[in-house]
Amino acid sequence: MSTFEDADTEETVTCLQMTIYHPGQQSGIFKSIRFCSKEKFPSIEVVKFGRNSNMCQYTFQDKQVSRIQFVLQPFKQFNSSVLSFEIKNMSKKTSLMVDNQELGYLNKMDLPYKCMLRFGEYQFLLQKEDGESVESFETQFIMSSRPLLQENNWPTQNPIPEDGMYSSYFTHRSSPSEMDENEL
Protein backbone atom coordinates (compact mmCIF):
# COMPACT_ATOMS: atom_id res chain seq x y z
CA MET A 1 0.00 0.00 0.00
CA SER A 2 1.50 3.34 -1.03
CA THR A 3 1.65 6.31 1.24
CA PHE A 4 1.01 9.95 0.55
CA GLU A 5 4.76 10.67 0.47
CA ASP A 6 5.37 7.99 -2.17
CA ALA A 7 2.59 9.10 -4.51
CA ASP A 8 3.54 10.63 -7.86
CA THR A 9 3.22 14.38 -8.15
CA GLU A 10 0.30 15.22 -10.39
CA GLU A 11 1.14 17.68 -13.15
CA THR A 12 -1.31 20.21 -14.47
CA VAL A 13 -2.40 19.62 -18.06
CA THR A 14 -2.59 22.19 -20.87
CA CYS A 15 -6.22 22.81 -21.79
CA LEU A 16 -7.47 24.19 -25.09
CA GLN A 17 -10.88 25.70 -24.40
CA MET A 18 -13.09 26.19 -27.47
CA THR A 19 -16.22 28.30 -27.33
CA ILE A 20 -18.18 27.65 -30.51
CA TYR A 21 -21.10 29.21 -32.35
CA HIS A 22 -23.03 28.53 -35.55
CA PRO A 23 -26.38 30.15 -36.45
CA GLY A 24 -27.87 26.70 -37.15
CA GLN A 25 -26.56 25.01 -34.00
CA GLN A 26 -30.09 24.24 -32.75
CA SER A 27 -30.47 21.78 -35.65
CA GLY A 28 -27.94 19.38 -34.11
CA ILE A 29 -24.76 20.36 -35.98
CA PHE A 30 -22.76 19.85 -32.76
CA LYS A 31 -24.64 16.80 -31.42
CA SER A 32 -21.52 14.61 -31.39
CA ILE A 33 -19.55 17.09 -29.26
CA ARG A 34 -19.65 16.75 -25.48
CA PHE A 35 -19.90 20.22 -24.02
CA CYS A 36 -18.39 21.44 -20.73
CA SER A 37 -16.53 18.21 -19.92
CA LYS A 38 -12.80 17.99 -20.57
CA GLU A 39 -11.41 15.33 -22.88
CA LYS A 40 -7.80 14.18 -22.53
CA PHE A 41 -5.46 13.31 -25.44
CA PRO A 42 -1.84 12.12 -25.57
CA SER A 43 0.42 14.91 -26.83
CA ILE A 44 1.48 12.81 -29.82
CA GLU A 45 -2.09 12.80 -31.17
CA VAL A 46 -3.27 15.09 -33.97
CA VAL A 47 -6.85 16.18 -33.25
CA LYS A 48 -9.03 16.29 -36.38
CA PHE A 49 -12.23 18.29 -36.92
CA GLY A 50 -14.64 17.64 -39.81
CA ARG A 51 -17.71 15.65 -40.82
CA ASN A 52 -16.15 12.17 -41.18
CA SER A 53 -16.70 10.34 -37.89
CA ASN A 54 -14.28 7.56 -38.90
CA MET A 55 -11.37 10.00 -39.18
CA CYS A 56 -12.20 12.93 -36.89
CA GLN A 57 -12.36 13.14 -33.11
CA TYR A 58 -14.81 16.05 -33.38
CA THR A 59 -17.49 15.94 -36.06
CA PHE A 60 -19.98 18.45 -37.38
CA GLN A 61 -23.31 17.22 -38.78
CA ASP A 62 -23.12 19.54 -41.78
CA LYS A 63 -22.58 18.62 -45.46
CA GLN A 64 -20.87 21.96 -46.08
CA VAL A 65 -18.01 20.94 -43.76
CA SER A 66 -15.14 19.00 -45.35
CA ARG A 67 -14.45 15.40 -44.35
CA ILE A 68 -11.45 16.78 -42.48
CA GLN A 69 -11.83 20.55 -42.07
CA PHE A 70 -8.78 21.31 -39.92
CA VAL A 71 -6.35 19.67 -37.51
CA LEU A 72 -4.72 20.77 -34.27
CA GLN A 73 -1.31 19.35 -33.45
CA PRO A 74 0.44 19.88 -30.13
CA PHE A 75 4.18 20.60 -30.08
CA LYS A 76 6.78 22.10 -27.80
CA GLN A 77 8.52 25.32 -28.82
CA PHE A 78 12.30 25.24 -28.67
CA ASN A 79 13.45 26.29 -25.16
CA SER A 80 9.89 26.07 -23.80
CA SER A 81 8.48 23.78 -21.13
CA VAL A 82 4.81 24.01 -22.18
CA LEU A 83 2.77 22.66 -25.07
CA SER A 84 1.78 24.88 -27.97
CA PHE A 85 -0.56 24.07 -30.86
CA GLU A 86 -0.44 24.52 -34.59
CA ILE A 87 -3.52 24.56 -36.78
CA LYS A 88 -3.61 23.30 -40.36
CA ASN A 89 -6.42 23.81 -42.88
CA MET A 90 -7.27 20.47 -44.49
CA SER A 91 -10.16 21.73 -46.65
CA LYS A 92 -9.61 22.19 -50.37
CA LYS A 93 -12.82 24.20 -50.75
CA THR A 94 -12.90 26.56 -47.75
CA SER A 95 -10.28 28.88 -46.30
CA LEU A 96 -9.78 29.01 -42.56
CA MET A 97 -9.43 32.37 -40.81
CA VAL A 98 -7.31 32.53 -37.64
CA ASP A 99 -7.84 36.04 -36.31
CA ASN A 100 -7.15 37.99 -39.52
CA GLN A 101 -4.82 35.43 -41.11
CA GLU A 102 -6.29 33.40 -43.98
CA LEU A 103 -5.11 29.81 -44.27
CA GLY A 104 -5.62 28.03 -47.58
CA TYR A 105 -5.46 24.28 -48.15
CA LEU A 106 -2.56 22.71 -46.19
CA ASN A 107 -1.45 26.08 -44.78
CA LYS A 108 -0.63 25.99 -41.09
CA MET A 109 0.34 28.37 -38.31
CA ASP A 110 1.01 28.42 -34.58
CA LEU A 111 -2.07 29.20 -32.51
CA PRO A 112 -1.88 32.27 -30.28
CA TYR A 113 -3.00 31.90 -26.65
CA LYS A 114 -6.36 33.43 -27.61
CA CYS A 115 -7.72 33.66 -31.13
CA MET A 116 -10.87 33.64 -33.26
CA LEU A 117 -11.14 30.79 -35.75
CA ARG A 118 -13.71 30.99 -38.56
CA PHE A 119 -14.81 29.03 -41.61
CA GLY A 120 -18.20 29.29 -43.31
CA GLU A 121 -20.61 30.41 -40.58
CA TYR A 122 -18.65 28.63 -37.83
CA GLN A 123 -17.00 30.73 -35.13
CA PHE A 124 -14.57 29.34 -32.53
CA LEU A 125 -12.97 31.31 -29.73
CA LEU A 126 -9.86 29.32 -28.76
CA GLN A 127 -8.09 29.98 -25.46
CA LYS A 128 -5.11 28.02 -24.16
CA GLU A 129 -4.41 27.46 -20.47
CA ASP A 130 -0.84 26.28 -19.94
CA GLY A 131 -0.08 23.17 -17.93
CA GLU A 132 3.12 21.47 -16.80
CA SER A 133 2.65 18.13 -18.54
CA VAL A 134 4.03 17.59 -22.04
CA GLU A 135 2.65 14.04 -22.14
CA SER A 136 -1.00 15.01 -22.61
CA PHE A 137 -3.44 17.88 -23.09
CA GLU A 138 -7.17 18.45 -22.73
CA THR A 139 -9.89 20.02 -24.83
CA GLN A 140 -13.08 21.58 -23.53
CA PHE A 141 -16.04 22.83 -25.58
CA ILE A 142 -18.51 25.52 -24.60
CA MET A 143 -21.48 26.46 -26.80
CA SER A 144 -22.27 30.14 -27.15
CA SER A 145 -25.85 31.23 -27.70
CA ARG A 146 -24.68 34.43 -29.42
CA PRO A 147 -22.25 35.16 -32.26
CA LEU A 148 -18.73 35.32 -30.85
CA LEU A 149 -17.54 38.18 -33.05
CA GLN A 150 -19.97 40.63 -31.44
CA GLU A 151 -19.84 39.10 -27.94
CA ASN A 152 -16.06 39.49 -27.67
CA ASN A 153 -15.77 42.80 -29.56
CA TRP A 154 -13.79 41.26 -32.41
CA PRO A 155 -13.87 43.19 -35.68
CA THR A 156 -16.91 42.18 -37.71
CA GLN A 157 -16.02 40.17 -40.79
CA ASN A 158 -18.02 38.60 -43.58
CA PRO A 159 -18.51 34.82 -43.49
CA ILE A 160 -16.11 32.87 -45.67
CA PRO A 161 -17.96 32.03 -48.91
CA GLU A 162 -18.44 28.43 -50.03
CA ASP A 163 -15.77 28.74 -52.74
CA GLY A 164 -13.35 29.52 -49.91
CA MET A 165 -12.02 32.74 -51.40
CA TYR A 166 -12.60 36.27 -50.27
CA SER A 167 -13.55 38.76 -52.93
CA SER A 168 -11.55 41.99 -52.85
CA TYR A 169 -14.90 43.79 -53.11
CA PHE A 170 -15.83 42.55 -49.62
CA THR A 171 -12.43 42.68 -47.96
CA HIS A 172 -11.53 46.26 -48.88
CA ARG A 173 -14.77 47.93 -47.84
CA SER A 174 -14.72 49.27 -44.31
CA SER A 175 -18.40 50.13 -44.09
CA PRO A 176 -21.63 49.34 -45.92
CA SER A 177 -22.36 51.47 -48.95
CA GLU A 178 -25.62 52.31 -50.61
CA MET A 179 -26.19 51.60 -54.24
CA ASP A 180 -28.91 52.76 -56.58
CA GLU A 181 -30.78 49.83 -58.11
CA ASN A 182 -29.91 51.21 -61.58
CA GLU A 183 -26.20 50.77 -60.79
CA LEU A 184 -26.60 46.97 -60.62
UniProtKB/Swiss-Prot annotation:
It comes from the Eukaryota. GO terms for biological process: cytoplasmic pattern recognition receptor signaling pathway; innate immune response; positive regulation of canonical NF-kappaB signal transduction; protein homooligomerization; tumor necrosis factor-mediated signaling pathway. Keywords: Cytoplasm, Immunity, Innate immunity, Phosphoprotein. Its main location: cytoplasm. InterPro entries: FHA_dom, SMAD_FHA_dom_sf, TIFA. Highly expressed in the spleen and at lower levels in heart, brain, lung, liver, kidney and testes. Disulfide bonds: none annotated. It is found in: Cytoplasm. It holds the Pfam family FHA. The modification Phosphothreonine is found at T9. Residues 152-184 are annotated as: Disordered. Phosphorylated at Thr-9 following detection of ADP-D-glycero-beta-D-manno-heptose (ADP-Heptose) by ALPK1. Phosphorylation at Thr-9 by ALPK1 leads to the formation of an intermolecular binding between the FHA domain and phosphorylated Thr-9, promoting TIFA oligomerization and TIFA-mediated NF-kappa-B activation. GO terms for cellular component: cytoplasm. Residues 168-177 have a biased composition (Polar residues). Residues 47-103 form the FHA domain. Belongs to the TIFA family. Homooligomer; homooligomerizes following phosphorylation at Thr-9. Interacts with IRAK1, TRAF2 and TRAF6. Interacts with TIFAB; binding to TIFAB inhibits TRAF6 activation, possibly by inducing a conformational change in TIFA. Interacts with ZCCHC11; binding to ZCCHC11 suppresses the TRAF6-dependent activation of NF-kappa-B. Adapter molecule that plays a key role in the activation of pro-inflammatory NF-kappa-B signaling following detection of bacterial pathogen-associated molecular pattern metabolites (PAMPs). Promotes activation of an innate immune response by inducing the oligomerization and polyubiquitination of TRAF6, which leads to the activation of TAK1 and IKK through a proteasome-independent mechanism. The FHA domain recognizes and binds phosphorylated Thr-9, promoting homooligomerization and subsequent activation of NF-kappa-B. This is TRAF-interacting protein with FHA domain-containing protein A. It comes from Mus musculus (Mouse).
